[in-house]
């Protein structure tokens, strides 16, 4: 079962071993569930999402850290929207929310190129990368704007919607694709390289 991933973590003495053990446990569990050489598209879809879910719940795995950051972003989006509805000042919250650019930089440096170059999966890099940049740039422009009129608030709501949609796409499209393709060695490389980035809302890249 994919839940065996969690027990596998306790066999490694280091985070590196934990990641490797988790990947091995997932791979073995999927092999056990194979009933034939050919699987239907539905089976592949389910397997892909089960694998991504297992890795997202594996402490120490890069997908766990990415998901933890996304949960924080989603909470901040809700807080900003709530403050706007009450007519509150969201300037500080907008400035803080720009930390999402760090998350986007990690994807742009560590995930998109690997998918496109090594696996020739260009969709995420061709589409999501552009949207990431647009969200980042719009947040920067909004943060610098002094006139917080109705038009400004509409722009805030619009960019929050796009950021929220990106979280959904990462969870349901990007992460499952990565989970089905990246090797344990590649995940370990992402884990190591992520240490070079600043933390997001205090969430360490561990």
Question: Over which residues does each language-model region extend?
Answer:
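Small-residue-biased structural context
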Residues: 1-101, 105-206
